[in-house]
Design a protein with these regions (language model features):
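FIC/Doc superfamily catalytic core
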Residues: 1-183, 187-304
Length: 304
């Protein structure tokens, strides 16, 4: 699928989603809450948490995970879930104060000395070869990034998905390059992606830990050296398509089935179906890490 095809398909899916959203707001809230644990587990896994999805669900249900787990990982799951739940139910506009409050929640019981504040004085941070912004300028740089995001989305045609996804991608890259906190930058940054989608009436996305070295880290590294955020825009477009496909399928189809079962019935090789799913040329989506699709979906055969 070409870049043009992605945006055309995304525009079509957003329009379909918005029509469903007016009639199924409660169902969409439940879908978002049902995938909360998966989003939490994946975001923490990007930061090397060892908690599985089952572990995370146990923690969020008030139980201890199986086996020997670090207490920090338990706090990480509970705290990120609290921030995500606030995002899904809240209406407060995106601001520096909101970011700091969410950061305080995220690091509560983990790094109370650093929770809810920007880096200070000699609190420099490094991720691999990337050095975060000078701590003396962090507050101003983040304020500038927020101002630019507001300007980008104000100028953008809200009906044109490319402009708003591009603005969110640029902000995320800039946020991660600044690295405003001593700890928790990645998790808060990914929360902010979904806050921005939420404010635009769009569903949350899940950045997958398994694909971080292929899909997520390279666009951040490229932006840090070239100011080019196109790779992040492309990634967020595909993740948003997947999220829309999931919601449209759950609201309009009687059953969803594993992609492997659909591929067998459609006489398509499994690896071909999986590749189509990754490129979102079919309306497949992941539930509990497994590719899934509406049972009644029939792929259109191009004319010969």
């Amino acid at each position: 699928m070409t870049a043009t095809d992605v945006w055309t398909r995304l525009d079509e899916r957003i329009r379909a989603y918005q029509q469903l959203r007016t009639r199924h707001s409660q169902a969409l809230e439940q879908i978002a809450l049902a995938e909360l644990a998966e989003g939490v587990q994946q975001s923490n896994a990007i930061e090397n948490s060892t908690l599985t999805l089952d572990d995370t669900e146990a923690v969020l249900a008030g139980r201890l995970p199986a086996g020997r787990k670090e207490l920090r990982e338990v706090f990480e799951a509970k705290n990120l879930a609290a921030v995500t739940a606030d995002l899904l139910t809240g209406t407060e506009p995106l601001s520096t104060d909101l970011i700091l409050r969410w950061h305080a929640t995220l690091l509560a019981g983990i790094r109370d000395d650093a929770a809810g504040r920007f880096r200070r004085a000699n609190e420099w941070v490094r991720v691999g070869g990337h050095l975060g912004a000078n701590p003396g300028f962090v507050s101003g740089l983040l304020a500038d990034a927020l101002d630019r995001y507001r300007q980008d989305t104000t100028r953008a045609d809200r009906e044109a998905p490319r402009a708003v996804v591009d603005a969110i991608a640029r902000f995320h890259c800039e946020f991660e390059v600044i690295h405003p906190f001593v700890d928790g930058n990645g998790r808060i940054g990914r929360v902010l992606i979904n806050k921005q989608f939420h404010d635009l009436g769009l569903p949350p996305v899940i950045v997958r830990a398994r694909n971080r070295d292929r899909d997520y880290y390279p666009p951040l590294a490229r932006y840090a050296t070239t100011d080019d955020h196109e790779g992040m825009t492309s990634l967020l477009a595909l993740l948003l398509l997947e999220s829309l496909h999931k919601r449209i399928a759950l609201l309009t189809s009687a059953r969803v089935i594993p992609l492997a079962d659909w591929a067998r019935a459609a006489e398509i090789r499994g690896n071909v179906a999986a590749n189509k799913a990754r490129r979102q040329t079919i309306p497949a989506f992941r539930m509990r890490h497994r590719w899934t699709i509406a049972e009644d979906y029939h792929e259109m055969t191009p004319p010969t």
